[in-house]
């Protein structure tokens, strides 16, 4: 998939990661400037703060709006950092550009709405500003790509993606499920698109930010956007997921950034073994499907239903236990066999519907 892109060229002391940091919300001039100066002293080059805050429920702090934009301008003037804020409407775009905001990002609630995305895209026509598009709240890669395409078709070539995880009713560890396979697939389809990880919104807790930052680096993400506040416990929004500039600096100092492209003969040989295993897997799946088609013919001849629930549950239980003995998670095995079963049912239905 092709997008017409130019490098973001974000300032950074190293090739990877670029880091955008700052409070969830621009609360007061004092809070903004204190946080910004502390981050600048730690070597941060890009400052983020929410000016307009789309909250899940009414009644919470929803941002200071235009009142906060002069504070962002002051940050740039006094520290030299680039400034970034979230925009959700054409009016937001107009005001952000009026006050010299350097980087715009689109939030998860906005990217999930094609009407809102098109309105933003129209407002960005003829503008040369970097835009980062956050994944939609629901795990829909096509919706994410569509949002990126709309902005790109408006003429925005300095484009990036933010991965902040996906909403889930069942919240166990993370505030938003990482579902790393989705940004990985986005990178596979659009390899030239920079992807930035938001560990603050994925984790929802300070103690998860460091491991999530490291995992993002291990997966080859280009940068991090992290919520940092001069006094996190007193934050007006998302206090639990913000860290002080000092703590953020410590987290970043511990990161191990691995080479993305370095390869050796030993690695090449191991990948050859993987390829051979994959070939064997495909042969076994083809053999299994041949047997499934024979079963489909038998069911048709004996007027049996395609789905035999007891048999399917038996397979899931047995293969889950087998996976655990082999050092794999039962959930992983269940996902595999759900897909295999889905394809088996599809092929048997074809046989059943043959005249």
Where are these regions (language model features)?
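N-terminal amphipathic alpha-helix/helix-capping segment at the start of soluble metabolic enzymes
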Residues: 1-20, 74
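Catalytic alpha/beta core domains of metabolic enzymes, predominantly
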Residues: 12, 116-250, 254, 259-265
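Hydrophobic faces of well-ordered beta-strands that scaffold small-molecule active sites
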Residues: 17-23, 45-49, 83-85, 104-106, ...
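Active-site mouth loops of central-metabolism enzymes
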Residues: 17-34, 58-60, 82-87, 107-108, ...
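A structural motif
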Residues: 41-44, 101, 156, 221
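Glycine-rich, proline-tolerant flexible connector loops at the mouths of alpha/beta enzymes
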Residues: 48-66, 230-239, 295-306
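Catalytic beta/alpha-barrel core
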Residues: 64, 80-89, 93, 102-116, ...
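Domain-level signature for soluble enzymes in the chorismate/prephenate branch of the shikimate pathway
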Residues: 260-355
